């Protein structure tokens, strides 16, 4: 247990931030998984693009709040975009 008032406050603040960061990260990961699941189930292009936009938004919100680093956000969006683009390209060719 902290002895100083400022140390007690740091414990409160860090616990509050931990819970918020966990919520941002969980939301982001669930939306990414939804996109990947839609690709695996061969859903329509419109549906995948809608899920992809929501995933991008969740990733950006997590980065904006500081839950993840901006470079990690960029990397996650880029890798997800590559997978979506590959699927949509294959779908156009009728594979």
UniProtKB/Swiss-Prot annotation:
Family annotation (InterPro entries): Ribosomal_bS20, Ribosomal_bS20_sf
Gene3D superfamilies in alphabetical order: Ribosomal protein S20 (1.20.58.110)
Example of a GO cellular component annotation carried by this entry: cytosol
Domain of life (superkingdom): Bacteria
Record keyword Hydrolase present: no
Keywords assigned by UniProt, alphabetized: Ribonucleoprotein, Ribosomal protein, RNA-binding, rRNA-binding
A single MF term (Gene Ontology): small ribosomal subunit rRNA binding
A biological process term (GO) from this entry: translation
NCBIfam families reported for this sequence: S20
Similarity comment: family membership: Belongs to the bacterial ribosomal protein bS20 family.
Task of the protein: Binds directly to 16S ribosomal RNA.
Protein name: Small ribosomal subunit protein bS20
The organism's taxonomic lineage, starting at the top: Bacteria, Thermotogati, Thermotogota, Thermotogae, Thermotogales
């Amino acid at each position: 247990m902290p002895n100083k008032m400022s140390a007690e406050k740091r414990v409160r603040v860090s616990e509050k931030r931990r819970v918020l960061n966990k919520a941002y990260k969980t939301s982001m990961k669930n939306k990414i998984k939804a996109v990947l699941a839609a690709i695996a189930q061969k859903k329509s292009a419109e549906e995948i693009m809608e899920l992809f936009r929501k995933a991008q938004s969740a990733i950006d919100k997590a980065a904006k709040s500081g839950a993840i680093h901006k470079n990690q956000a960029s990397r996650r969006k880029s890798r997800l975009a590559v997978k979506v683009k590959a699927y949509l390209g294959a779908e156009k060719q009728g594979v």
